[in-house]
Amino acid sequence: MKIDSTTKVFGLIGHPVKHSLSPLIHNSSFEKLNFNGVYVVFDVAPELLENAVKGLKALGIKGFNVTVPHKESVMNYLDFVTEEAEKIGAVNTVVNENGILKGYNTDVQGFIDSLKELKEDVRGRKAFVLGAGGASKAICFALAREGVESIVIANRTLNKAKALAEYIREEFKMKCDYCSIEEVEKFNEIDILINTTSVGMHPEVGNSPVSEEVVAKANFVYDLIYNPSETLFLKYARKNGVKSANGLSMLVNQASYAFYLWTGEFFDKDFVYEKIRGEM
């Protein structure tokens, strides 16, 4: 990779970000396509988000991804947000078009494409979603679009779960309930169980958002976390013979849409998966 005075700079803002595979994905793809770009990470504490976004804009950063905990709050500091991202209430990709910061959400389609790669048909099924933040909003939208019968949103902060459940009910005219994380234990039947929280990510690798007993009830378990590749949540699934997947395919698929927004080209997903396997 050659960096010169015309190199376009892209990046990721979040807190933490040192676990991220996004630099590997984008930098290897820039190189493969002979695109003069570089992708770096910026660890931005919540109280510094506004200043960080202003700084990225002032420096002419061409685009950036947004990860936890900024997917919702970053919307306050953008010049434009797409209708879909506005509806979802979360942005994960920003394009700088001549000083105008435009926010997009590629998580929804990234998750849908991930389900297709996994050959997991969710139509008519019941889903439990752990967490009610920006990632959860995208997952709930994706599940609703793909035709699940119902969604239960479980979150430590009940009012966030309630607000999201009410919004999904209204937007999609479907059954969507909410409960606390602890109350998930009381459900006897859990078909699809999805973790959108950061519990299990470094440095909380010894924790799971729910108990092994809850995971064992599920038919399919999905963890948006991809590093570590097998969280305790997913270890519970493997131990109990439950089909499961981590968030790697969602990461790659949403990244391919972000890459397209920045460059006008999709990257080679097979090449990217090969690169990741080489690193992990």
Curated annotation (Swiss-Prot):
The answer to whether the entry has keyword Electron transport is no
Protein keywords: Amino-acid biosynthesis, Aromatic amino acid biosynthesis, NADP, Oxidoreductase
Q: Which GO terms describe its biological process?
A: amino acid biosynthetic process; aromatic amino acid family biosynthetic process; chorismate biosynthetic process; shikimate metabolic process
Q: Under the GO molecular function aspect, what terms does this record hold?
A: NADP binding; shikimate 3-dehydrogenase (NADP+) activity
Q: Fill in the subunit field for this protein.
A: Homodimer.
Q: Which residues bind NADP(+)?
A: 83, 131-135, 155-160, 224, 247
User: Where along the chain is shikimate bound?
Assistant: 20-22, 67, 92, 107, 226
Chain coiled-coil ranges: none
Write down what this protein is called: Shikimate dehydrogenase (NADP(+))
Q: Which Pfam families match?
A: SDH_C, Shikimate_DH, Shikimate_dh_N
What is known about what this protein does? Involved in the biosynthesis of the chorismate, which leads to the biosynthesis of aromatic amino acids. Catalyzes the reversible NADPH linked reduction of 3-dehydroshikimate (DHSA) to yield shikimate (SA).
Q: Which gene encodes it?
A: aroE
Judging by the UniProt lineage, the source's domain of life is Bacteria
Q: Which CDD domains match?
A: NAD_bind_Shikimate_DH
Query: Matching NCBIfam families, A to Z?
Result: aroE, PRK00258.2-2, PRK00258.3-3
